[in-house]
Amino acid sequence: MSQYIVCALYKFVSLEDYTEIRQPLTQVMEDNQIRGTLLLASEGINGTVAGSRKAIDTLLTWFKEDSRLADVVYKESINDVQPFNRTKVKLKKEIVTMGVEGIDPLHVVGTYVKPADWNALISDPDVLLVDTRNDYEVDIGTFKYAVNPKTETFRDFPQYVAENLDPAKHKKVAMFCTGGIRCEKSTAYMKEQGFDEVYHLEGGILKYLEEVPEENSLWEGDCYVFDGRVAVNHQLEKSHYDVCNACRLPITDEDKQSDSFEKGVSCPKCIDQHTEEQKSRFREREKQVQLANERGETHVGGDAAKLIEQRKQEKKEKKQQQRSSK
């Protein structure tokens, strides 16, 4: 059985010519049948891709040919199936979107903590441990002692800090995320806001799960990942979660037994969030997916993704209205 190397990577580095990198990077991915998405911006590179061992090694060698990307941070895991449908290299304003101007992890950032030293830090009662990930990620797994900010997107994090954290009260703050990149931005932001002792887990949750034995671990549950595996367990293997193709949120076997679940159309988390017209489109898309599967092909559709972005924008506008009415 063929195995795929899933490679999550990022690096904050000045890439003024990032638009010119897109074409050759796309070419090396396509030539080596690597799928996934990489983001390029003037502040660096970020993304997750998957391919054969030889293909991923070729990509990493390609990065080494550019001195700016030679030491790109990456973490690998293995999967039995290709977790991505497409090959994409996108140009962005930020490689991880916080929406705050002037936050530069190359200028200031929190203190990195190795996975081997993480347990001791977060067990300190004087340390406030904050999970910087989104609410749906935290729901399926997090560290013992961690606070859930209940953010819907990373853009909500600055508001959480403004409303809940105080440099005079919270002297020591530790943060973590999936692979480390969000903490680069969040710790930089915290330092800019006057927080002195700010720490973050080097390599993120994935590196911790890789290096810390499960019997010594303070991780509880599974770790959400942004690919077809949905979530991984402590052994970095695909766990029991699937994804609802209507809202893209993780679902369990129990969710699939609910009367609110219709494959590709709705789940208990989104049953009331889509119109009947939207659900009809989802049913048609699911039909096309099944037909493609019968032909041994992969169906790629965009309706669900568009609706998710629309829903995020609606929630953002609702929050802004609530804040302005206070």
From Swiss-Prot:
User: What SUPFAM superfamilies does the record point to?
Assistant: Rhodanese/Cell cycle control phosphatase
The Gene Ontology terms for molecular function here are: oxidoreductase activity, acting on paired donors, with incorporation or reduction of molecular oxygen
Positions annotated as active site in the UniProt record: C177
Query: Enzyme class, one word?
Result: oxidoreductase
Composition-biased stretches, type Basic and acidic residues, lie in 276-320
Reactions listed under catalytic activity: uridine(34) in tRNA + AH2 + O2 = 5-hydroxyuridine(34) in tRNA + A + H2O
One biological process term in Gene Ontology: tRNA modification
Which parts of this chain are annotated as the region Disordered?
A: 276-326
> Which EC number(s) does the record attach to this protein?
1.14.-.-
The chain positions of domain Rhodanese read 123-217
- What InterPro entries does the record point to? Rhodanese-like_dom, Rhodanese-like_dom_sf, TrhO, TRHO_N
Q: Which UniProt keywords apply?
A: Oxidoreductase, tRNA processing
Has the keyword Oxidoreductase been applied to this entry?
A: yes
In terms of superkingdom, the source organism counts as: Bacteria
The question of whether Iron-sulfur is a record keyword is answered with: no
Q: What does the function comment of this entry state? A: Catalyzes oxygen-dependent 5-hydroxyuridine (ho5U) modification at position 34 in tRNAs.
> What HAMAP family has UniProt attached to this entry?
TrhO
Give the similarity note: Belongs to the TrhO family.
- The name this protein carries in UniProt is tRNA uridine(34) hydroxylase
Q: Which lineage is the organism of this entry classified under, starting from the top rank?
A: Bacteria, Pseudomonadati, Pseudomonadota, Gammaproteobacteria, Vibrionales
